[in-house]
Amino acid sequence: MRTDNRTAGQLRPVQITTGCLMTAEGSALIKVGNTHVLCAATIEDTVPPFLRNTGKGWVTAEYSMLPRATAKRTPREVTKGRPSGRTHEIQRLIGRSMRSAVDMSSFGERTLIIDCDVIQADGGTRTASITGAFVAMALAFRQLIEYRALKANPIRDYVAATSVGLVGGIPMLDLCYEEDSQADVDMNVVMTGGGKFVEVQATAEHSAFDDAQMAELTELARTGIAQLVRMQKEIIEG
């Protein structure tokens, strides 16, 4: 039994609330256990210079954490003058994950920006951000269709993410902060609704792992992501 009384293959309680921001084209507040992330999607009628006059759009993301999202206050990165390497890595991961699910040639020269702001952190902030960001993005594209600015939905597939790890030699799904800090191996997995991998980030923190352990962890992640995609579908498709 784990610190929060879950079984090894059990997700934390997940709740996704939409329409949290009346000013955003799409928004979702995702709660994965005690990790809470507010995701907001904005659509702008412009694209980066490398896409001008191509007829293609772009999807990108920004990620940040409130100072008291963590047990000890973390200073705002704006006071340091630039985002940290960790922040750059996470927001690029979110952007790549969203682009994997979208046909960039089907929504014109527009940019969809997803802001992911961590309100409370207890492990898995990047994976929660990806799962919530997809919902916000889907709602933003739906609004374009309702306003007749788009004829077809640019989304090709769903995308969601979760963490897995080896804690005390036991494969576990959806690690909280305490488990993550004790893990021998931790892994973040992003997959499509069709079961294809978008990204796998795996690190041996205290001991190396073999092919069989990696396969076991990715399959465990697959079961969790399938549950998350079902939740997304219930929200988006009603």
UniProtKB/Swiss-Prot annotation:
State its Enzyme Commission number(s): 2.7.7.56
Asked if the record carries the keyword Lipid biosynthesis, the reply is no
Q: Which InterPro entries match?
A: ExoRNase_PH_dom1, ExoRNase_PH_dom2, ExoRNase_PH_dom2_sf, PNPase/RNase_PH_dom_sf, Ribosomal_Su5_D2-typ_SF, RNase_PH, RNase_PH_bac-type, RNase_PH_CS
| A GO BP annotation | rRNA processing
GO molecular-function terms, A-Z: 3'-5'-RNA exonuclease activity; tRNA binding; tRNA nucleotidyltransferase activity
Q: Which residues bind phosphate?
A: 86, 124-126
Q: Which keywords has UniProt assigned to this entry?
A: Nucleotidyltransferase, RNA-binding, rRNA processing, Transferase, tRNA processing, tRNA-binding
Report any Pfam family annotated for this entry: RNase_PH_C
Which reaction is catalysed here?
A: tRNA(n+1) + phosphate = tRNA(n) + a ribonucleoside 5'-diphosphate
Question: Could you describe the subunit structure of this protein?
Answer: Homohexameric ring arranged as a trimer of dimers.
Family assignment from sequence similarity: Belongs to the RNase PH family.
Task performed by this protein:
Phosphorolytic 3'-5' exoribonuclease that plays an important role in tRNA 3'-end maturation. Removes nucleotide residues following the 3'-CCA terminus of tRNAs; can also add nucleotides to the ends of RNA molecules by using nucleoside diphosphates as substrates, but this may not be physiologically important. Probably plays a role in initiation of 16S rRNA degradation (leading to ribosome degradation) during starvation.
Query: What's the protein name?
Result: Ribonuclease PH
- State the organism named in the record: Solibacter usitatus (strain Ellin6076)
Gene this protein is translated from: rph
